[in-house]
Regions:
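Short, acidic/small-residue loops that bind anionic groups at enzyme active sites
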Residues: 55-71
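Gly/Ser/Thr-rich active-site loops/lids in small-molecule metabolic enzymes
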Residues: 145-182
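Short glycine-rich anion-binding loops that position phosphate/pyrophosphate groups of nucleotides
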Residues: 41-44, 65-67, 150-153
Length: 256
């Protein structure tokens, strides 16, 4: 029999939770070769998912970080019991293809968002397209975000982007501190879209392209699309699902 896999961050809180689980699994083991328990914060979960992007396993996150939006709350009394009752959701990442000023092409996936950020004191000068359709001919700003529904309550929300429900089949494009045009609020588009972002002045106004926390500098042309060939199966406690967390954030946004 193959027992579940436990992956934890290296901080004291994570290791303490891991030790607790191992001790209790010896008393009452869960024989499930498809279950991966991830102990840490959101950043650690994103890192773990990317390392296992070709896996068909189910990931149950336990928060030992700060906010832990993608994680479940740890409870000595209830966590062990919650594994068998957890609800699954499936999310698809973004795929980012970056061509830099030297013509080199790099690729990465992003679970939360792709961030296009100015790389110097100069604001970024960008054009944004959805396929062949121009969304905005010239955006002068600190950058722009392309966010998934799962990531719409993270960095995207901080730049006043819209919160997307998990079943919306949408992506959000949100400007960061737009200077021209000042009133452009971004756009919600289909998750089938192919987004093309071009640096209009790469020599004077360099930009970085960041997939979650992986940065590629001196980007010139960026293509962003949903990768339906990669999927992540996440498990959540039935009383605190990811859908419910997103709904709570929507209500908070509407009432503030």
């Amino acid at each position: 029999m193959i027992k579940q896999i436990i992956i934890s961050d290296s901080n004291k809180k994570s290791l303490k939770i891991k030790s607790f689980l191992i001790k209790n699994f010896k008393k009452k083991p869960i024989f499930n070769s498809n279950l991966v328990i991830v102990i840490g914060g959101d950043g650690f979960m994103l890192k773990t998912l990317k390392k296992n992007k070709n896996s068909s396993k189910f990931f149950y996150g336990i928060n030992s970080g700060n906010y832990g939006f993608l994680m479940n709350k740890f409870s000595p009394k209830h966590t062990i019991k919650n594994f068998s009752k957890a609800k699954m959701i499936t999310i698809f990442p973004l795929e980012m293809i970056v061509k830099n000023k030297q013509g080199l092409i790099k690729k990465s996936i992003a679970i939360n968002e792709v961030s296009i950020l100015r790389q110097s004191k100069q604001a970024a000068s960008l054009s944004i397209q959805n396929g062949a359709k121009i969304i905005i001919k010239k955006l002068i700003s600190d950058g722009v975000l392309v966010s998934t529904p799962a990531g719409s309550t993270a960095y995207n929300l901080s730049v006043h982007g819209p919160i997307l429900s998990l079943n919306s089949k949408k992506l959000s494009i949100s400007p960061i501190s737009p200077f021209r045009p000042r009133r452009w609020k971004g756009k919600i588009i289909s998750d089938k879209s192919i987004i093309k972002i071009k640096n209009l002045n790469p020599k004077k106004r360099p930009i970085s392209a960041v997939a979650d926390n992986l940065e590629f500098r001196n980007a010139k042309d960026i293509i962003i699309k949903t990768n339906k060939k990669i999927k992540f199966n996440l498990l959540y406690d039935s009383n605190r699902s990811l859908q419910k967390k997103i709904k709570i954030e929507q209500i908070r946004k509407e009432t503030t």
